[in-house]
């Protein structure tokens, strides 16, 4: 090949002589990258504008180059020789130009060299094109060869398939032509013309096999059924495995994507670090290069000064000769009479030492850079391994955590299902059994004030009914349902006698079981506080938190409103059900109020001190009418502001806190757990002793609030477990029932000094005092402090009656023991015209739990 390493070398059998071949063996020029892309443009000689580097030419030994075939030296000087300009060159001695004949010869040689360089580039480009075509043709040949072998294999397979198909077709044709005249024996290879011959053959030759055939058929059928069943099971397990594999693949792909993103981020950081290191290295290289250039400039300046001195010496010593002779004399003088050869040697040694010094320094810098790079790479690998270990540990921890949470969630779901099943069982039983199951001991304790047993607080099972996975809105709804009272319905005389007999029979069991099984009130309080604290911690509420933030409250209330709207969409007739139930309840209350007012008329009464109340006014336990509790959901009824006065005038005939819940009666046992209320006579006595604080207009405003506003405010107060709700939703109902039962409870004996109109005014003022703002957002104020402050203000404004029991001026906590004397001394006081206060059911003061 004439081209080796993109350099043109002429062939050995060229017509030129050995000198020409030696000269032509020099590499002319490297092939530019644009030469292989296509044909070269039109050739044109370049102008000569470069000056001759005489110093470089004088350093070349031509005989040595020709003898050693030093192509590299020729390659280094080919551009200067080809494109140098000799017209302006003058003799340093005579200052005359170059000989024209010699100049013409040199120009022809330059043009020849340039043309040869152009030819070399063109031939190199053509050679590259031919090599590329050859490579493509070889690739096509390999592909065609592979395709040919593949097609030969396919042809062979097709031939075999054709042979097999031919055999199959021939056998099928024979079977079709034979039709029914061909009968094959199942036990041997013999064939018969008809079925009779086949049967005789089987009886004669295969008697035992025929009996076995029937048995084998049954076995094969049974095995076939088992195989089908196993196939179905296999298909089911295969589908399960595919679904599990798909989920695993999805999880693995997610993990892989996360890991890949992390690796990409890490690679980006690594690339950024590499770029920074490259920039630093380039800066150092630039600094070293600048230093080299400065030293090189200094050396060139010194060298130029020495050359100038040398030229001055030559001008003074050499005579003027002809043009050609002067050139030869100059070279001879430079070779023979070199001024100061010791200085040149010193200069060369200095240059060599500096070059070796800088090369050593450069090598040291490269080694340091490689060491730092290796250290950083090892550090990166360590970081990556540690990161992977941490990620694996975190994954194991989170998987374990997810499994634990899943188990807890499953247990809670099972608990919820069991509780709902119990509620359904209670709902399916008769009403009397439900009342006995729910709170027979508790209601009997409230109805028999002679017993000295303390009021049993709410057990920890009520708090356990709250689901740990439910939201805060469900907690508010459950707490709201616990504060709803049941109306009191009077019984007939026969029912009273039957109930009294039943009470006498079950008195010991109903009263002794709570006292024997239930612990003391202090222990119950501590247990309830502990259970409540654990449940609040499970909801993420710490012990130091004094309330729920407004954002969480608003969000939970919005979620509750959305749920109610969805329920209203699912049941379009829910509003009609509410209105019908409300109408029925109001009608019943009006009938009972009218009947009681017609039969009993109360004359003007006089008040007695608490110690001087007659025995007739103090109602004993046996003379008090028994009550039957009925589960009724209560709520406020929105009243327009224009009818406020009419509503206030008929306040005794209306039941102001009556409303159906936002769900049907069928869903009541499944949706919410009703919490039993407990007796708090001291709190009722305190509420009765407090005089009115504001006018009746305040109660009207509080009663006029809309449906949604009341529910939001009441639930906000219920979440704090403060007794404010008992003032709004319980006391009004209590006073209304008291005014109904007043004539019956007094036993038709009038107490002098009391006016029914005054009683109504006092009851309305008491209702106004108990109505609180439902939209109050101050969750941390205790109801106990409010009632104490109200009691102190009342004492400042109006002096209490003489010989008043001090226990009535402050609210007794529901957790404390009940004083038996309070049941006996409870009668008609100044602000207590009703005798049924001890029989009413109130809500436990939950604020005590939060205060602790």
UniProtKB/Swiss-Prot annotation:
Keywords, alphabetical: Cell projection, Cilium, Cilium biogenesis/degradation, Coiled coil, Cytoplasm, Cytoskeleton, Developmental protein, Differentiation, Metal-binding, Nucleus, Phosphoprotein, Spermatogenesis, Zinc, Zinc-finger
Tissues expressing the protein: Expressed in testis and undifferentiated ES cells.
Positions with biased composition (Low complexity): 451-463
Subcellular location: Cytoplasm, Cytoskeleton, Cilium basal body; Cytoplasm, Cytoskeleton, Microtubule organizing center, Centrosome, Centriolar satellite; Cytoplasm, Cytoskeleton, Microtubule organizing center, Centrosome, Centriole; Nucleus
Pfam families named in the record: Dzip-like_N
A Gene Ontology cellular-component term: ciliary base
Location of the region described as Required for interaction with DAZ1 in the Swiss-Prot/TrEMBL record: 139-262
Region: Mediates interaction with GLI3 and localization to the cilium basal body, residue numbers: 1-351
Start-end of Polar residues biased regions: 512-524, 686-697
Top-level division of the source organism's lineage: Eukaryota
Region annotated Mediates interaction with GDI2 and RAB8A, chain positions: 430-600
Function according to Swiss-Prot or TrEMBL: Molecular adapter that recruits protein complexes required for cilium assembly and function to the cilium basal body. At the exit of mitosis, localizes to the basal body and ciliary base of the forming primary cilium where it recruits and activates RAB8A to direct vesicle-mediated transport of proteins to the cilium. Also recruits the BBSome, a complex involved in cilium biogenesis, by bridging it to PCM1 at the centriolar satellites of the cilium.
Protein family according to the UniProt entry: Belongs to the DZIP C2H2-type zinc-finger protein family.
Annotated protein name in UniProt: Cilium assembly protein DZIP1
Species in which this protein is naturally found: Mus musculus
The gene coding this protein: Dzip1
């Amino acid at each position: 090949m004439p081209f080796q390493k993109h350099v043109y070398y002429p062939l050995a059998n060229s017509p030129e002589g050995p000198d020409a071949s030696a000269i032509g063996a020099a590499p002319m020029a490297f092939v530019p990258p644009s030469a292989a892309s296509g044909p070269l443009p039109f050739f044109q000689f370049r102008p000569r504008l470069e000056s001759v580097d005489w110093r470089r030419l004088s350093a070349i030994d031509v005989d040595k180059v020709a003898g050693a075939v030093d192509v590299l030296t020729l390659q280094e000087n080919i551009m200067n020789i080809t494109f140098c300009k000799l017209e302006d060159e003058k003799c340093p001695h005579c200052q005359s130009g170059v000989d024209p004949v010699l100049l013409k010869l040199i120009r022809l040689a330059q043009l020849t060299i340039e043309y040869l360089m152009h030819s070399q580039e063109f031939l190199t480009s053509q050679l590259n094109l031919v090599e590329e075509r050859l490579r493509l043709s070889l690739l096509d040949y390999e592909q065609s060869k592979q395709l040919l072998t593949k097609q030969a294999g396919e042809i062979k397979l097709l031939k075999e398939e054709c042979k097999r198909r031919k055999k199959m077709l021939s056998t099928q044709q024979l079977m079709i032509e034979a039709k029914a005249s061909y009968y094959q024996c199942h036990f041997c290879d013999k064939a018969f013309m008809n079925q009779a011959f086949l049967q005789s053959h089987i009886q004669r030759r295969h008697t035992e096999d025929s009996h076995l055939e029937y048995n084998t058929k049954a076995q094969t059928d049974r095995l076939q059924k088992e195989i089908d069943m196993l196939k179905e099971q296999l298909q089911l397990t295969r589908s399960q495995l595919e679904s599990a594999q798909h989920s695993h693949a999805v999880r693995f792909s997610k993990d892989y994507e996360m890991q890949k993103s992390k690796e990409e981020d890490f690679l980006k950081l690594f690339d950024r670090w590499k770029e920074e290191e490259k920039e630093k290295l380039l800066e150092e290289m630039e600094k070293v290069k600048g230093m080299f250039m400065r030293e090189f400039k200094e050396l060139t300046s010194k060298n130029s000064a020495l050359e100038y001195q040398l030229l001055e010496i030559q001008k003074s010593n050499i005579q003027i000769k002809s043009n050609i002779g002067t050139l030869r004399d100059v070279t001879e003088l430079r070779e023979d009479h070199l001024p100061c050869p010791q200085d040149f040697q010193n200069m060369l040694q200095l240059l060599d030492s500096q070059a070796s010094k800088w090369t050593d320094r450069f090598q040291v810098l490269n080694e340091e850079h490689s060491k730092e790079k290796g250290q950083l790479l090892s550090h990166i690998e360590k970081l990556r391994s540690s990161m992977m270990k941490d990620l694996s540990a975190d994954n194991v921890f989170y998987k374990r955590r997810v499994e634990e949470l899943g188990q807890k969630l499953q247990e809670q779901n099972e608990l919820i299902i069991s509780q709902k099943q119990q509620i359904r069982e209670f709902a399916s039983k008769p009403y009397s059994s439900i009342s006995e199951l729910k709170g027979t001991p508790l209601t009997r304790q409230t109805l028999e004030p002679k017993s000295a047993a303390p009021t049993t607080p709410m057990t920890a099972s009520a708090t356990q009914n709250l689901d740990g996975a439910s939201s805060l809105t469900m907690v508010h709804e459950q707490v709201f349902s616990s504060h709803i009272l049941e109306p009191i319905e009077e019984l007939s005389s026969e029912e009273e006698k039957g109930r009294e007999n039943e009470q006498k029979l079950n008195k010991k069991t109903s009263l002794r079981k709570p006292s024997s099984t239930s612990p003391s009130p202090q222990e119950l309080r501590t247990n309830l506080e502990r259970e409540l604290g654990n449940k609040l911690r499970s909801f993420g509420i710490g012990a130091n938190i004094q309330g729920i933030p407004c954002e969480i409250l608003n969000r939970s209330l919005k979620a509750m409103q959305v749920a109610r709207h969805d329920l209203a969409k699912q049941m379009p007739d829910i509003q009609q059900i509410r209105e019908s139930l409300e109408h029925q309840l109001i009608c019943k209350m009006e009938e009972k109020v009218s009947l009681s007012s017609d039969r009993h008329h109360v004359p003007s009464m006089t008040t007695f001190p608490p110690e001087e109340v007659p025995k007739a006014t103090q109602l004993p336990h046996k003379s008090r009418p028994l009550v039957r509790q009925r589960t009724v959901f209560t709520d406020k009824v929105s009243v327009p502001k224009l009818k406020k006065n009419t509503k206030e005038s008929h306040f005794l005939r209306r039941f102001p806190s009556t409303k159906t819940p936002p769900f049907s009666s069928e869903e009541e046992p499944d949706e919410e757990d009703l919490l039993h209320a407990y007796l708090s006579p001291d709190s009722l006595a305190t509420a009765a002793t407090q005089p009115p604080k504001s006018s009746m207009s305040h109660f009207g405003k509080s009663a006029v609030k809309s449906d949604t506003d009341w529910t939001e405010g009441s639930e906000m107060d219920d979440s704090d477990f403060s007794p404010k709700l008992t003032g709004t939703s319980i006391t009004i109902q209590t006073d209304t029932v008291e005014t109904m039962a007043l004539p019956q409870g007094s036993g038709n004996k009038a107490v002098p000094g009391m006016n029914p109109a005054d009683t109504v005014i006092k009851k309305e003022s008491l209702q106004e005092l108990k109505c609180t703002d439902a939209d109050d957002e101050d969750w941390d104020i205790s109801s106990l402090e409010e009632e104490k402050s109200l009691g102190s203000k009342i004492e400042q404004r109006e002096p209490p009656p003489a010989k008043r029991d001090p226990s009535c001026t402050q609210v007794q906590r529901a957790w404390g023991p009940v004083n038996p004397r309070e049941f006996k001394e409870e009668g008609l006081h100044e602000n207590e015209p009703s005798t049924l206060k001890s029989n009413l059911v109130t809500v436990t003061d939950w604020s005590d739990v939060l205060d602790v």
